[in-house]
Amino acid sequence: MLEEKFLDLLAQKYDSEEKVVTEIINLEAILDLPKGTEHFVSDLHGEYQAFQHVLRNGSGKVKEKIRDIFKHELSEKEINEFATLIYYPEEKLQLIRNQFDNKQELNAWYTKTIDQMIRLIPYASSKYTRTKLRKALPKQFVYIIEELLYKTDEYTNKKHYYSKIVQKVISLGQADKLIIGLAYTTQQLVVDHLHVVGDIYDRGPEPDKIMEALINYHSLDIQWGNHDVLWIGAFSGSKVCLANILRICARYDNLDIIEDVYGINLRPLLNLAEKYYKDNPAFRPKRHSNKKLSDQEQSQITKIHQAIAMIQFKLEMPIIKRRPYFNMSKRLLLEKVDYENNKITIDGKTYPLENTCFATVNPDQPDELLEEEKQVMDKLLFSVQHSEKLARHMEFLMKKGTLYLRYNGNLLIHGCIPIDENGNMEKMFIENKTYAGRELLDIFENYLLHAFSNREATDDLATDMVWYLWTGEYSSLFGKREMTTFERYFIKDKALHKERKNPYYYLREKEGICRMILEEFDLDPDQGHIINGHTPVKEIEGENPIKANGKMIVIDGGFSKAYQPTTGIAGYTLLYNSFGMQLVAHQHFNSKEDVLQNGNDVLSVKRLVDEELERKKISETNIGEKLIEDINMLNSLLKYRYLK
């Protein structure tokens, strides 16, 4: 009965036998096309400039296509110039126009360049239907471009007609707009789908611009990282997540993200900080090489940093106490401080404290917030939850994001799957029930969704669980035994700063472990891979990003400048097309200007991870599964409505 109702509804769209048959033929044909190119990036950490370059060049795919077509016509220098025009059309056109003294020479350049771009588009779109290509073309030029794309030299009757179209575009002053449109179309055609494997946010200065770029991207999904979840948590009502964000922004001198970008007023926090705190070397912001700070600004940030860190430590304590199964009582450090002698006892050993800032702490009840601190946090939370721009970014993050993704036979995950040293899934006890493996990640995601849709609740289990995802030992995003923030600020002994990683991080080198994890997520261990972000690959020390006989691929894009000295390169991205998987290593990205002026690209080498024996078709992908369902439904409609 229900199926008949659905078929009646479907018949409104396909109201003739011809329409149904045409759609079935169309979908069956699409199933036979090669799968599109997937592009995997990870750990963007707010570094917009480096990220958008990788997005524009498709991790080298754009230049590869240019080279395939023009290798016998253009020199290496000309190929680089052409590639730069496709990456940054507006800026490159400006530079090129300035090189010409007369209009004739410029027009000749326009004619040649438009012709080259029109030749590149069919090659870049060879895996797509005409309908899909039409959707990617710049709207105002669709008719003109299609005329130029589908010309054939079989008959020469139209040669003059095609030439006239291009000359008219130039004489009407539309050449720049056409070239810009074709450049962005090429960028879009080269990558069919983007996977962002976590951490859009962190210490970098422009996560908001990354979010805007992703919102405008044609096709993508996101696997949340630990820093993304922190921002989602703050927006969902978690004051302790909010305190963490503010502390990290103060530490890395990025408070303008909070104030200027998202419009959140920090004046109440500054007033509190000025009242209770002084200069403190442990809390001075990390300097940006390209950003000057006055002494007064440094002093204000140092005080804000202390104020919000102390609020954070206080806010953590009630959560730890009301959720004993978080197993975090060791983190109740403010209760272990000897305030008179400035010492702390941890695991039976006493350590001196330095650079302390306990002015607002009541030694008898260390988790007690001052009335002023409560008011400041209430105001900040209100501002965060009423920031229009932040709401748009967080809603997009939730709409496109998941904790893990099963896609085309692979498992995409930012952090880890918590396992013990014997390789068994670690169990977590929540509300009288035990969870492990995929079930644990599913329950984490349920709590996150619940917290996001109930933002007025600030201390329910769902909101507490979002904070646990940031810092808890069984969190798939944190993947360490404890977070030693307090120790790093106040205790000199480096042994206490160490954060022990989950055994996953050394066991993922073993093929057997990776196969077990793939099976846990109902994926074929012979065909599937785990694609993992979160940890920088220390190439400098000989670490290999391809592990476990090719079953595990670690791609930290290395966009965060802070980690680059430890990795030796900037990082890795991954491409997966119908021929197989390629890992792309990136050098440091200097600046857009460097690319424009010198054609310097940041790609170095590509390594083959896996080669398909036969080209993979759309029928073997997630999209293919959906199309097969549609075809079955249309066949049912055909029988039900038209073949009776």
Swiss-Prot record:
It is an enzyme of class 3 (hydrolase). Pfam families: FBPase_2. GO terms for molecular function: fructose 1,6-bisphosphate 1-phosphatase activity. SUPFAM superfamilies: Metallo-dependent phosphatases. Keywords: Carbohydrate metabolism, Hydrolase, Manganese. Pathway: Carbohydrate biosynthesis; gluconeogenesis. It catalyses: beta-D-fructose 1,6-bisphosphate + H2O = beta-D-fructose 6-phosphate + phosphate. Its cofactor is Mn(2+). Gene3D superfamilies: 3.60.21.10. One of its GO terms (biological process) is gluconeogenesis. Its EC number is 3.1.3.11. Belongs to the FBPase class 3 family. This is Fructose-1,6-bisphosphatase class 3. It comes from Oceanobacillus iheyensis (strain DSM 14371 / CIP 107618 / JCM 11309 / KCTC 3954 / HTE831).
